[in-house]
Amino acid sequence: PELTGDVSTDAWAKLLWHEQFTTPARPDAQPTPGTSFAMAHDGDSLFFAVKCKALAGEAPEELARENVQIQLDSERRGLRSGIFVCYTDGKASSAIELEADGKEAWLGEVGYGSRLQAGGWSMVLKVPLSQLAHVEEGLQRIQFNVSRVLRAHGAPNSLLSYPAPKNIHFWRPSNATGEAEFE
């Protein structure tokens, strides 16, 4: 897949898109429509694509201030995870979050592209599989979390996650609870 941020191409249309984004720390919360993601790999890199539609009442300038945070725990132990913060302006940052509080630098380069347009934005993140530490022979499974940060942090309903963690500290490695298996 290309890193243009355009997720309407054939490569993305064939994938399974997940849409059950809900508010963290609210087990009774209903999914909020308008956010979905897909994941793929090509043997060399892992790709995440996210589509974010403007929510009811969301102004264009609010949409432009959003970001998506993707957390990957390739060791599946909840001790450390890569976190990738992806912005609408095409910029991204990456780090390693530690469960024992603290951060380390992400040692590698990632690819990123975004596309902001009226009514929504989309993004594609590319992480080389060689940069993901793992505990077994070959990288076969990862745990992950995808979060959409909507408005100023701390505002009501400012965060949607898939899967929704049990607490609001979504960047904690122990909250990477979704699991993907490579075929």
Predicted stretch roles:
Residues 1-183:
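Structural preference for beta-rich elements and adjacent junctions enriched in aromatics
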